[in-house]
Amino acid sequence: MGTNKPVVIGIAGGSGSGKTSVTKAIFDHFKGHSILILEQDYYYKDQSHLPMEERLKTNYDHPLAFDNDLLIEHLQQLLAYEQIDKPVYDYTLHTRSEEIIPVEPKDVIILEGILILEDPRLCELMDIKLFVDTDADLRILRRMQRDIKERGRTMDSVIDQYVTVVRPMHNQFIEPSKKFADIIIPEGGQNHVAIDIMVTKIATILEQKVNL
């Protein structure tokens, strides 16, 4: 473990942009090394105090849906090489689960999420900020496939949510946050050149830590 603080790489982008694929490609390349993924999706606010009818109204694409205070606290703990207990979100109950996931600190932290660049406090903790930029048509197709297959949603409900919530929130919050990125990656996980560049950069960081 290095003596300096860990390096934080932020990977943002709209839902279905391919940011998770970019994150996984980078992480898989460094399996066995000192690297971890911290997903903003795990940090939706606890809503156990609300009745189910209120939880069902949750706008998961709005900045206020996230417990960024807890995310920042956990990120600061990891930067101090302290273990955290990552929360788990239950999408069937629309609230935080009682389950937690212990996460050990690593030398490289990949922070991934749709709105991580929207919060200046999170941006201040990142060393490298990436935005995965993908065509809107491809993003909605990917989101439909994910929500129908993994979350038991109907096609009509996914389309309705996209038109009334996802697209407006993307245009209002996610797209404008792109200006805070150091690097914009078009074509998401298919952009192997950009991924290779990031792999090379991270390899250099890890090598420097080993030589400290």
From Swiss-Prot:
**Identification of the protein by name:** Uridine kinase
CDD domains referenced in this protein's UniProt entry, alphabetically: UMPK (cd02023)
The species is Bacillus cereus (strain G9842)
Q: What is its main location?
A: cytoplasm
Kindly name one Pfam family recorded for this protein: PRK
Residue intervals passing through the bilayer: none
One GO location term (cellular component):
cytoplasm
What would be an example GO MF term here? uridine kinase activity
The alphabetical list of record keywords is: ATP-binding, Cytoplasm, Kinase, Nucleotide-binding, Transferase
**Record flagged with keyword Transferase:** yes
Localization terms from the record: Cytoplasm
Q: Which GO terms describe its biological process?
A: CTP salvage; UMP salvage
Query: So where does ATP get bound?
Result: G13, G14, S15, G16, S17, G18, K19, T20
Q: Which family does it belong to?
A: Belongs to the uridine kinase family.
Which pathway does this polypeptide act in? Pyrimidine metabolism; CTP biosynthesis via salvage pathway; CTP from cytidine: step 1/3; Pyrimidine metabolism; UMP biosynthesis via salvage pathway; UMP from uridine: step 1/1
Q: Which reaction does it catalyse?
A: uridine + ATP = UMP + ADP + H(+); cytidine + ATP = CMP + ADP + H(+)
Task: Name the Enzyme Commission number(s) assigned to this protein.
Answer: 2.7.1.48
Lineage runs: Bacteria, Bacillati, Bacillota, Bacilli, Bacillales
